[in-house]
Amino acid sequence: MLLKLLAGLTAAVVAAAPAAGASDRELAAGERVFRSQCMGCHSVEPERNRAGPTLHGLFGRISGTLEGFDYSEAMRTAAVEWTPETLDAFLERPEAVVPGTKMVFWGLRPNDRRGVIAYLEVAAQ
């Protein structure tokens, strides 16, 4: 019983920990970039779509599969699995990763991408 409790507590601590290697400063910077560049169209709250889909539970999801959001045909057929690496490429040049995406976005600089991804790894769980 005690082992199960300890295993559960360990899992909870690991899940709540910041993204590997992300400092508090990087997380705060990522949140600022998210709020200024992403939040107009995206939320990190469950079931809270805006002009873009919610990013809650993004990592591990396949592009274009969130129920209740009207994705472009390009996003549905791209079948990109969202990982920190694929999101980094997408946030650099969305059209290069998903040609025909209806997301109008010019891309982010490398430091901003790292910060946003670190923030989403924590906030969008």
Cite the ranges covered by each PLM segment:
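Bacterial N-terminal signal peptides
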Residues: 4-16
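Generic alpha-helical structural context detector
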Residues: 11, 56-60, 89, 118
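Electrostatic cytochrome c docking/interface patches
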Residues: 16-35, 44
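Gly/Gly-Pro-rich "capping" loops immediately C-terminal to redox-active cysteine motifs
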Residues: 27, 31, 43-84, 102-107
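Sec-exported extracytoplasmic/periplasmic mature domains
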Residues: 35, 39, 46, 60, ...
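Hydrophobic packing within well-folded, soluble alpha/beta domains
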Residues: 38-41, 116
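C-terminal capping alpha-helices of c-type cytochrome domains
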Residues: 83-125
